[in-house]
Amino acid sequence: MNKILAANQTLTSEAVSEGHPDKIADQISDAILDEILKVDKNAKVACEVIITQNLVVIAGEINSPVKKTLDIKEIAKKIIKDIGYTNIDYGLDYKTITVIDAIGNQSQDIINAIKKKGSNALGAGDQGIIFGYACDETKNFLPAPYELANSILKKASNLRKSGAIEWLRPDSKSQVTIEYDKNRRPVKIKNIIVSHQHHPNISQKLIREPIIEEIIKPTIQDKSIIDENTTYCINPSGNFVIGGPTGDTGLTGRKIIADSYGGFARHGGGAYSGKDATKVDRSAAYMARYIAKNMVAAGISKEFELQLAYAIGIENPISIQITSGINDPKYANKILNFIVNNFDLTPNGIIEKLKLKQPIYLKTCTYGQLGKNEFEWEKLDFVKKIQTVLKK
């Protein structure tokens, strides 16, 4: 992103909960991917879900013998149950859903493009523009509004599932606006929005205080960035009783900004969920994040954005570019040469480095695809080498 040149400018990010209709679809897509990978590590999967009312339609293309034995309906039901949709009054009920399986086979043309006969190499599963980003605003190297927006909803989910706040229901969204100084450092939370589905028999007056005092404030680590001027918009539309797929149709891949950096970085448009690692929309996005995070952690810059571009069937990226964080062209070229010579950016190289044949994807797809330190692409194991070669 461009540098902020004036003080008192604000930046905003949003997040959605696991019970948001689009996120239900993402989770079903990734749960299906995981179940296939448990048996077939080399499966090719592109799974798309649409969910509306009490209907789930599962489509896409899968190339794996596991498809024949996969219990699609049970996978979908388990996800919906685990989220907390156990009563149709919530907007969905796992016990009564209708599931339509419309999954087809992967195109033979695509199969041939990805895997050439007589070669172990993998070409990219599609063309695409991919970005990876990191900044030094938080300990997870993510933008502060984005991290806080997700943390608020995770806290709400924990309190809902534990029964600590009984009137909460699964569907929710948040949005955080933070004021920055002229050096682009976060200095104050200006506004927090939380829209949370709730039981019909509770008033908005009784909803407001628990959301602020039990969910929002305990989530904010740095108390100095909130004050009496911080405003809270809690269910600004009024009642939020009708939620889940009864209120809105959900679709896989429709929350790509909430999945990545909350609007702080560019996005090539490709979604993550339901895709195996030959799809560079997902795997190369993880790799670009890994590189960017290690660059910022090494002190190369306060923020770093990397663009990768691929062509279907071709191993190596056709373009690599630093798109934010480095202003010196000569230094940028030195960094690019380092990236090319030290990181394998082919699909095979990325899959091996980041261990992407494992059934890990359901864990990635809620509350941000990035910033979860359990995953390989969040490791800071390249920092020392970067500092040795590149640190000015």
UniProtKB/Swiss-Prot annotation:
Its main location: cytoplasm. L-methionine binds at E61, Q106, D248, K279. K(+) binds at E48. Keywords: ATP-binding, Cytoplasm, Magnesium, Metal-binding, Nucleotide-binding, One-carbon metabolism, Potassium, Transferase. Its EC number is 2.5.1.6. Residues 106-116 are annotated as: Flexible loop. It is found in: Cytoplasm. Binds 2 divalent ions per subunit. Binds 1 potassium ion per subunit. SUPFAM superfamilies: S-adenosylmethionine synthetase. GO terms for molecular function: ATP binding; magnesium ion binding; methionine adenosyltransferase activity. Pfam families: S-AdoMet_synt_C, S-AdoMet_synt_M, S-AdoMet_synt_N. Mg(2+) binds at D22. ATP binds at H20, D171, S172, K173, D248, R254, K255, A271, K275. PANTHER family: S-ADENOSYLMETHIONINE SYNTHETASE. Catalyzes the formation of S-adenosylmethionine (AdoMet) from methionine and ATP. The overall synthetic reaction is composed of two sequential steps, AdoMet formation and the subsequent tripolyphosphate hydrolysis which occurs prior to release of AdoMet from the enzyme. This is S-adenosylmethionine synthase. It comes from Borrelia garinii subsp. bavariensis (strain ATCC BAA-2496 / DSM 23469 / PBi) (Borreliella bavariensis).
